[in-house]
Every structure is written in structure tokens, then in C-alpha cells.
Amino acid sequence: MSKVRIYTLAKDLGVDNAKMLEILDGLGVAYKSVSSTIEEDTVELIKQILEEEGHTASAEPAPAQASGSPASPAQTEAQEAPQPTATATAEREPAAPPARELPHRAPVVTIMGHVDHGKTSLLDYIRKTKVAAKEAGGITQHVGAFEAKTSKGKIVFIDTPGHEAFTTIRARGANVADIAVIVIAADDSLMPQTREAIAHAQAAKVPMIVAINKVDLPQADPEKVKTDLTQLNLVPEEYGGDLIVVPVSAKTGEGVEDLLEYISLTAELEDLRADPQGEFSGVIIESRVDRQAGVLATVMVQEGTLHVGDFLVVGENYGKVKAMTDSNGGRIKEAGPSTPVQVLGFSEAPSSGEKVVSVKNEHAARELVAQRVETRREAENARVQRKKTLEEMMGPLGETRTVNLILRADTQGSLEAIQGILARKETEDVKLNVMLAGIGSPTEGDVLLASTADATILCFNVTASGSVKKAAEQRDIELKSFRIIYELIDEVDRLIKGNVEPVFEERPLGRAEVRMVIRHPKSGNIAGSYVTDGLLRRNAKARVLRGKQVVYEGTIVGLKRFKDDVREVQAGYECGVNLDWNDVQEGDIIEASELVEVAQA
């Protein structure tokens, strides 16, 4: 019995992929994605359902929207469903007017992978074949991104292949790419930078598509690549997983159309939308200083529309858009979502990954920049780093915590031994997530990944260079090197212990009898007391007993011996106790206690 891919059937029947998945869900048919295959009898059932709904199957694909974006299920059904009769309309409850749906936007794609696996060659082939000849001939400057026109619409490619650029942008809190294409050479399979690229894409939580390049070579072995991917828990669809794997050749063009088709399908499922009428916001892709023109910055528009004449603020820098150039080198007056543009107008070159916003005028731009400068100066002067609360560091209480790790070792054997130990160290409360494990010294790319994923870098028998250590210090990343395996294990134990929900018990410190109440104009009532047992300590927990009843629970905010502030007072001495509570009375008993963390096995 023949099988057919879901997206192929949707295309042949002229329906939206989302509609097709909706029907399959109703039939209880299992699938991984729109590229999964279904049986012929299921195809017949789908056709019957569509006919009952009044849809006429078409041998030709449904026409693409003018914008090139995939239609939403609601739009598709509105176009395909028969018009209701007056009787049917009268029987329905009056529906509230639907909220304005945001239009779809083009996907933004980044290409990553190991050096020499063909990232740039693949981009060059796509640019050569998917950018109109007259436009391609007009490209005079590199703007960091380009638009490819396909049968499914526009796809934007970030033209700076490599995970370093991708993660540099993410490290500043910006997400630009919607989809990551991991390029792997069919004759080389997984290499260190391949694993790094995969780790970066996973940390960014963007959908991944694997392009197995160089399949035209005689020594190409795509099956080995697929098998190797399963070792990273990335299972190709044909093996029963959900990873899309596409064999391609950047040299001959084989499979490139399929790759673009899969990118469009993934984007459709992600349902990417943006409001061109909203407030403008974007991200700096790259910037440079041109000797003649001045500062040129490539901006990826994410929301709203950017116009010539707009005032922009990025970091502590602002400027007015004097001119804009699209990815084909042409002058434009405005740019909507998912459009990369080169902007002329900044006085200083902004950094990759910085967020860009628009303001009404120059006065507003100056005010916003001044506010940001003041905020930074206050932070610098105070030299205070905001300490994370226990819940921020460890997640909500009662949930499993995840400790992200990056491992570097001198040999593959050492790596495997360490990973085996880590697997045995996991507990119900703490999960150890090795984001990246590689042979050799840590890199600045590791530090970038650690900064975006809040990871710790552990090195065994390898040392970090001065520049990597400096980068780790600047980003406040824990980077530790070990020569003895047991020391590394001790560090892992420390990390686990630091992520286990602490258990505290209350232990008594001492008791005091209130013998007189002293009225103080600033501090309120002070309890003149005599310590009968143990000791009282400043900042200790306190409760006040009046007879057998507890009348107050709080903290000892201050202790005095005569006129001196003291930290604690032992039994047999008098003192003044400030409870920040004015109802204390003679004869009350103050009991002090402290919370002590209980050691856990």
C-alpha cells in the first residue's frame, strides 16, 4: 500500500497544512510533523471529510497569498467553506466580531555548522538562485542578511553563518532567528563545531533542520550522519523521530528546493506573526564604519514599520534614519517585519544583538539615552549586583532543578568517564544537563553559550586561555579546571547541593525576662530585659510570651548594653531589646531562636 507525505497531500488537495493536521487529529492518526507519511486508506478518509465540508479537491496547489505567507486555518476555512444560507445564519448565535489577526511574517533563518561543511556555499547557492538576477547584480554592499523568494513566499537568511554570531546576538537578550539550519558534510559527519552549533540552537529553543551537504561526493555517507545524530538524542523522522533531515548539495543544487520547502513548512507550523502597524522594534545584526558614508548598521525589523526620518535609540546611542538600503542594495523608504535593512544615521556603531526602538523626536531620544546613562552610572557607583533570590536561582520550590554544564576534557575517554559519573549523580530533585561536551580547551563560544543558558564550564586536564578566562570573568561565568577526577566530582556535588531545596530547623537560642519598658522618642518602646538562659542575638527570630499566650512573633532588630549597640548578650546580663513592637510589657518573656540549615545526605 502506497504512502504519501502529509504536506504533499495538503498541497495536492489545496488545503492548509494546519487544516490537514486538524483532520488527522480528529481521526486519531499519529504523526510527527507535516513531513510524516500516511496510508492510502487514511488519504481516502481525508478526501471524504473534505468533500462533506464542501471542499472541492484540486489537483493544483492552493494559490499563495500575496504576501507570500502561509494562510492561517481560519483564513483557509473562510475561503473554502460554502456561504451559509439565510436560515442557517438565523439559527446561529450572533458571534462577536473576531479580533484583528496579525499578518504572517517571513521566517528568519540562521545557518550553522562545522567549518568547511559548506555553510557559506549553501547560502551562496540560495542567494544566486533565489534572488532575482537584476537585484543580485545590484548588490554592492554586505548587509548581513538577504531575502530569498520561493514558491511559498519570502525567507530571510542571516548572512553571517556560524554559531558565534548567532549566540553573540542571543547573549544580549535578543532572539532573531526563528529556525536554525545545521549543515553537516555527508563525508565528514558530526564534528566538534557541529555539536556546538546544535547546543546553541537547543539553548535558543528554535526549531532545527539538518541539511546533509555534499551528497554529490562519491564518499558521501548520509546514513552515517543520521545514525550519529541519534547519539545526541536527535532522531530523524525516517527513524521514528521528529528531526527533519534533508540531503543537499550546495554545488549541484540537489535538495535545496526541498530544504526551502521544509523551512516554509516549519515556519507555517510556528505561526510566525507580527504587527506592521505597531510600535517599531528591531535588533542590530551587524554594523561597520564606512569611510565615505559613516556608520552603517544592519537592522532586522521585528515589529512595526521602520521609516526614513524615524528617530532610533539603541543602547546609549541614538540617531535619525537618513537613508535605508534593502538587502539588494536598493534605496527604500520603509521596511516591515522580517525585513533586514542597512540604516545610515547613527553617530556610533552599535553592537550586534542590541535592541532598537523608535521614539517620536530627537528630544525624546535624548531623554531616553540620558535615562539609560543615569541607570548605568547608578549601578556602577553602587557596585551592587542584584542577588538572585533562592527561587530565581533554583526555580519554584518543589520542582526539579536543572544544572546546565559545559564539559571540556583532554580525551574522549575522559569525557565519557565524566559523563558516566554525572549520569549516576543525578537525583529526583536535580537534573544535570550537559549542553556541550568537547575535547580541547574551552572557547569564547563556550562562554557565550554559558552566559545565555546560565551554565557552568568544567574542564578536566585542559586549561583556558587568558582571553577565555577574561571573557568568563566579564560575564560572571563559573569556569573551573581540574587535574584530579575526584576534585571535579566534588565540584559537581557542590553544584547539586546548591540546587537542592534547603531544609531548615528552628533551634532555641535563649530567654529573657522584661523587667521594665523604656520609652524612646525614635525607636519606640525598648524592652529592658534580663537574659535568664542562653543568649539573645541581633536579627534572631523572637516571640513574646505573656503568661502562656504568644502575643508577638518577629525579629530582634536591635540590642544595647547601656548606650552601646551589641551583637549578642549572654545569660546573666541586662540589655535593651528593640523588637520594633510597642506593646511589650513588664513580665513578658522573650524567647530567641534561629533557623539552621540541616545537612542532607
From Swiss-Prot:
Region of interest (G2), ranges: 138-142
Record keyword Transcription present: no
Region (G5): 249-251
Localization in the cell: Cytoplasm
Keyword Protein transport listed: no
GO cellular component: cytosol
Function: One of the essential components for the initiation of protein synthesis. Protects formylmethionyl-tRNA from spontaneous hydrolysis and promotes its binding to the 30S ribosomal subunits. Also involved in the hydrolysis of GTP during the formation of the 70S ribosomal complex.
Family according to the record: Belongs to the TRAFAC class translation factor GTPase superfamily. Classic translation factor GTPase family. IF-2 subfamily.
Name of the protein: Translation initiation factor IF-2
Origin species: Deinococcus geothermalis (strain DSM 11300 / CIP 105573 / AG-3a)
